[in-house]
């Protein structure tokens, strides 16, 4: 989960998020290299007294600064396209959960368990217990198994929302009249937090998402819900 004054990404809890972290480091390395070379060239330009004002054509240099950026863009685009394909890939899910966005709470439907439906509201400060997180904890958590592919069906009943859990690398828009889907496989148990990431009105910041991921064997004994 996130920490105060955190600069980096949250700890990855799914294969997709691990790929995103690797791609982030890959792109950041290229950006740092470009910035270093540009600053070094500026430093040499400002400090040296050697100038040549008679050069009007330099085919070799023009070729280099045309081909080199193209190569850099390819080095960034190829892994990005691979991750984009992986995020859109829908594997055979073991469980399907439907999430419906409202102003300003979420409704969840466990379609594989007798159509269990419940709402998830943010806990007001007066109801927080020791250890609860302000503006992030909810009255009803979504309980899911780890090491099992889960499909989330996401939509909205009023305005645009976005169902987002950073640790899992998930961000899917909830659009009225449209049903979007995404899949994920959590790699370790724990409690993971997210929020609506689409400005949806006055209480947009009061739409947290809490996933409680438990071992598959425990989940198979019977879904444990915090209702």
Swiss-Prot record:
One cellular component term (GO) for this entry is: respiratory chain complex IV
What membrane topology is annotated for this entry?
Multi-pass membrane protein
| Spans within the Mitochondrial intermembrane topological domain | 1-14, 88-227
**Gene Ontology molecular-function annotations:** copper ion binding; cytochrome-c oxidase activity
Q: Where in the cell is it found?
A: Mitochondrion inner membrane
Q: Which residues lie on this side of the membrane: Mitochondrial matrix?
A: 46-59
Name the coenzymes or cofactors required: Cu cation
**Ligand binding (Cu cation A1):** 161, 196, 200, 207
Membrane-spanning parts = 15-45, 60-87
Reactions catalysed: 4 Fe(II)-[cytochrome c] + O2 + 8 H(+)(in) = 4 Fe(III)-[cytochrome c] + 2 H2O + 4 H(+)(out)
Q: What is its EC number?
A: 7.1.1.9
Q: Please name the SUPFAM superfamilies in this protein's record.
A: Cupredoxins, Cytochrome c oxidase subunit II-like, transmembrane region
Keywords in alphabetical order: Copper, Electron transport, Magnesium, Membrane, Metal-binding, Mitochondrion, Mitochondrion inner membrane, Respiratory chain, Translocase, Transmembrane, Transmembrane helix, Transport
What Gene3D superfamilies does its record include? 1.10.287.90, Cupredoxins - blue copper proteins
Explain how, and how many, cofactor molecules are bound: Binds a dinuclear copper A center per subunit.
Q: Just give the chief location class.
A: mitochondrion
Per UniProt, Cu cation A2 binds at: 196, 198, 200, 204
Magnesium as a keyword of this entry, yes or no, is: yes
In this UniProt entry, which cysteines form S-S bonds?
none
GO BP annotation list: ATP synthesis coupled electron transport
> Which residues does the record give as Mg(2+) binding sites?
198
Report the function annotation for this chain.
Component of the cytochrome c oxidase, the last enzyme in the mitochondrial electron transport chain which drives oxidative phosphorylation. The respiratory chain contains 3 multisubunit complexes succinate dehydrogenase (complex II, CII), ubiquinol-cytochrome c oxidoreductase (cytochrome b-c1 complex, complex III, CIII) and cytochrome c oxidase (complex IV, CIV), that cooperate to transfer electrons derived from NADH and succinate to molecular oxygen, creating an electrochemical gradient over the inner membrane that drives transmembrane transport and the ATP synthase.
* Subunit-level organization: Component of the cytochrome c oxidase (complex IV, CIV), a multisubunit enzyme composed of 14 subunits. The complex is composed of a catalytic core of 3 subunits MT-CO1, MT-CO2 and MT-CO3, encoded in the mitochondrial DNA, and 11 supernumerary subunits COX4I, COX5A, COX5B, COX6A, COX6B, COX6C, COX7A, COX7B, COX7C, COX8 and NDUFA4, which are encoded in the nuclear genome.
- Family, similarity comment: Belongs to the cytochrome c oxidase subunit 2 family.
Protein name in the entry: Cytochrome c oxidase subunit 2
Originating gene: MT-CO2
């Amino acid at each position: 989960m996130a920490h105060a004054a955190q600069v980096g990404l949250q700890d990855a809890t799914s294969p997709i998020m691990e790929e995103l972290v690797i791609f982030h480091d890959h792109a950041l390395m290229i950006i740092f290299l470009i910035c270093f070379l540009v600053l070094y060239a500026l430093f040499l330009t400002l400090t040296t007294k050697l100038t040549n004002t008679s050069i009007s054509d330099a085919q070799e240099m023009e070729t280099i600064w045309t081909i080199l950026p193209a190569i850099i863009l390819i080095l960034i685009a190829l892994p990005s396209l691979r991750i984009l394909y992986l995020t859109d890939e829908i594997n055979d899910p073991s469980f399907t959960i439907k999430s419906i966005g409202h102003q300003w709470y979420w409704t969840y439907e466990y379609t594989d368990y007798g159509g269990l439906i419940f709402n998830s509201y943010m806990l007001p400060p007066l109801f927080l217990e020791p250890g609860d997180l302000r503006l992030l904890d909810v009255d009803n958590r979504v309980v899911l198994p780890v090491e099992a592919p889960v499909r989330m069906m996401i939509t909205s009943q009023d305005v645009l929302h976005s169902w987002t859990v950073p640790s899992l690398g998930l961000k899917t828009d909830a659009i009225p009249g449209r049903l979007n889907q995404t899949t994920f496989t959590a790699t370790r148990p724990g409690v993971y937090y997210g929020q609506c990431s689409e400005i949806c009105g006055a209480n947009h910041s009061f739409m947290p998402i809490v996933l409680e991921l438990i071992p598959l064997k425990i989940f198979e004994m019977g879904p444990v819900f915090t209702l």
